[in-house]
Design a protein with these regions (language model features):
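Short, charged cytosolic
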Residues: 2-25, 171-186
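C-terminal, active-site-flanking charged/polar segments
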Residues: 237-250, 254-255, 322-332
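C-terminal, non-catalytic macromolecule-binding modules
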Residues: 249-273
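Alpha-helical bilayer-embedded segments of polytopic membrane proteins, i.e.
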Residues: 35-83, 110-111, 160-174, 197-248
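Membrane-interfacial segments
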Residues: 62, 90-95, 184-187, 224, ...
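Membrane-embedded catalytic scaffold of the fatty acid hydroxylase/desaturase
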Residues: 74-198, 265-354
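Glycine- and acidic
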Residues: 4-6, 32-39, 90, 105-110, ...
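Membrane-interface, cytosolic juxtamembrane amphipathic helix immediately N-terminal to a transmembrane helix
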Residues: 20, 24-42
Length: 356
């Protein structure tokens, strides 16, 4: 039976302590809050207005076929963008200094079909603690179709996983909305990690959000535009969103240079938690302002994993501090200059996992 490991820092590194001191000093010296600002709130409102406007136009005004497909593609992109920029920061409590608005931002994902509650358990508690640890980190548990790390069992089909993976990635949101949320809900755990005890309100919110989504995204559109038109539009939206979400999240951890640490015999991880995060995480395209704006700073994954409660709008600034500290402590800082470089590395990693 797999149990959750402990981070022991057997080398006695002071890296994390020193890094926290330097980053905290940056905010104190510059008199800046660690949460979001007007630019983030403007982006959140912009994305939601665009999404709602497109939904109304597609469902109630029934534009032509190709126009509708184009708008569904845009809605798929906006679904991912809202997840990256609004829900993600809100879920980590970094969207605002107000707990109320952080809750609103975090649970906005419910309107997009996913459960904010299940996401919080899967992402904040499991993934951010046990990153890239096989058998615990749910983000690399895509068995048996994909072999993401060397300790997972290999099948013949994995020889081709670097080819068919892109189709599987398009299914992420569909599986998330219709299957994985329910698996976690009824099993009351994420992998081997138990869910936090759900309150009566949590149960009510889970089912209300699911029913509301099914009505708004399935029942009402079918009534308005007929089944076939709805099916095409729904698949275009969800598959495009799934592809974007999958690629951005996988480029952060499953590339050639990231590690997949295995606990020692006593079930300890030899490094302190912060060093573990850097060894298992990679950045990409950090100089590309458009990508950074669209993906909510998730191309700065090292910064995010080290300081998840700091809003992504601050990642470019604190990345300089983190790089410098990594250099001083001789810790490799993994970064791909362009997004295409990270995509190639991810593809080569999957190809290697299918052959070794």
């Amino acid at each position: 039976m797999i149990t959750t490991p402990k981070f022991r820092n057997i080398n006695g590194s002071s890296f994390h302590q020193e890094l926290k001191r330097r980053v905290n000093n940056y905010f104190i010296e510059n008199n800046k809050p660690q949460t979001g600002n007007f630019s983030l709130y403007f982006k959140a409102v912009l994305f939601w207005i665009a999404y709602i406007a497109l939904y109304i136009h597609v469902v109630f005004f029934t534009p032509g076929t190709w126009w509708s497909i184009s708008e569904c593609l845009l809605m798929g992109g906006l679904t991912a963008a809202i997840g990256f920029n609004v829900m993600h920061d809100g879920g980590h409590g970094s969207f605002s200094n107000s707990k109320f608005w952080n809750k609103i931002a975090a649970y906005s994902v419910n309107a997009l079909g996913a459960s904010g509650l299940m996401w919080s358990n899967k992402h904040n508690i499991v993934h951010h603690t046990y990153t890239n640890i096989d058998g615990i980190d749910d983000d690399i548990e895509i068995k048996p179709m994909l072999r993401m790390c060397p300790t997972q069992k290999k099948y013949f089909i994995h020889r081709f996983q670097h080819v068919y993976v892109w189709f599987l990635y398009t299914l992420l949101l569909i599986v998330w909305v219709f299957a994985s949320d329910y698996t976690k809900y009824f099993k009351k755990k994420v992998g081997i990690v138990p869910l936090k005890k759900l309150s009566a309100f949590d149960h009510f919110a889970f089912w209300t959000a699911k029913i509301g989504y099914y009505f708004m995204m399935i029942a009402l559109p079918i009534y308005m535009v007929a089944f076939v038109s709805w099916l095409v539009g729904f698949l275009v939206l969800t598959m495009f969103a799934g592809l974007i979400l999958s690629v951005v999240f996988q480029l952060a951890h499953t590339v050639e240079e990231t590690a997949f640490p295995t606990p020692m015999e006593n079930n300890d991880i030899e490094n302190e938690w912060a060093i573990h995060q850097i060894q298992t995480t990679a950045n990409f395209a950090t100089r590309n302002k458009l990508i950074c704006w669209l993906v909510g700073g998730l191309n700065f994954q090292i910064e995010h994993h080290l300081f998840p409660k700091i809003s992504h709008i601050h990642y470019p600034a604190i990345s300089k501090i983190i790089k410098k500290t990594c250099d001083e402590f001789n810790i490799k800082y993994i970064e791909y200059r362009h997004m295409r470089d990270a995509v190639v590395s991810h593809t080569l990693h999957l190809k290697r996992m299918g052959t070794i």
